[in-house]
């Protein structure tokens, strides 16, 4: 890809991120003091694995938005860290009302039933001591890659 093409792609990503952050302000990146960074280069939502985004990403963001609006907490809530741990999605945030905290538990639980790569429903697979939520297709793909 040319330099001009890369610049165009980055600009499109920033515009996409700005739209996401405008609608879902808690996905804005934060610094070490949990202060929002005025940047659209990335979002906390970028750390959600692609399979989980496909399976329930938009639904999850909308559920958070509705709960935060009901609790009048939309501008006070912030995701601090997003990651996969022990085969499930972990969403770490600042203090929030119980209704919002319950969503973190909900998505922690249901994420373990979806493939982290493609979003298909699956059963968590134990591979080499690691819990990896992969569907059979991706499990076979990984085996062939290792050979």
Annotate each predicted stretch with a short phrase.
Residues 129-141:
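Cysteine-rich micro-motifs
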Residues 39-90:
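Active-site acidic/histidine clusters and adjacent loop/turn architecture
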Residues 115-118, 135:
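Short cysteine-rich clusters marking metal-coordination/redox-active sites
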Residues 83, 102-113, 124-129:
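Short, flexible, mixed-charge glycine/proline-rich loop motifs
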Residues 19-22, 27, 45-53, 122:
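A conserved ligand/cofactor-binding region detector
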Residues 121-126, 140-143:
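Short functional micro-motifs and their immediate structural scaffolds
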Residues 1-19:
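Short Lys/Arg-rich cationic patches that frequently serve as NLS/NoLS or arginine-rich RNA/DNA-binding motifs
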Residues 74-76, 94-104:
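Short Cys/His-rich Zn2+-coordinating modules
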